[in-house]
Amino acid sequence: MEMHPEEGYTLLKEEGLKPTFYHDCSEEDIDLAKVHLGLQALKPMGVPVRTTNENFGSVRRVYIECLQDHALVPEFQKQMYTELPCEQVISMDTSHSPFMSAPGELANHLMSLS
């Protein structure tokens, strides 16, 4: 990841894309993903999120856990869904990008929730 604090953004380095986000994706899918990646603003990462039980607390929460994720390792994912409990945790044996590597399986999980 390339940080540019003066300009207010971060950029993913191309050499880190496959091992971090797409290690179980085809080269064709990785090329497609690259076309859609852009700069990420830094400012939102440092602004606290404020929610209320009345609004955010009333929304059903389900977590899709990616067991082969190298960007958000499973231990960190577990910490996230433990600190903000979810009704259900669905585990997938994929990288950070199940929408690229296992779209059918992901769609089936999402459809099962409706």
What are these regions (language model features)?
Residues 28, 35-104, 108:
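Conserved serine/cysteine hydrolase catalytic core
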Residues 110-114:
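Short, hydrophobic alpha-helical segments
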Residues 1-53:
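Helix-rich cap/lid subdomain of alpha/beta-hydrolase
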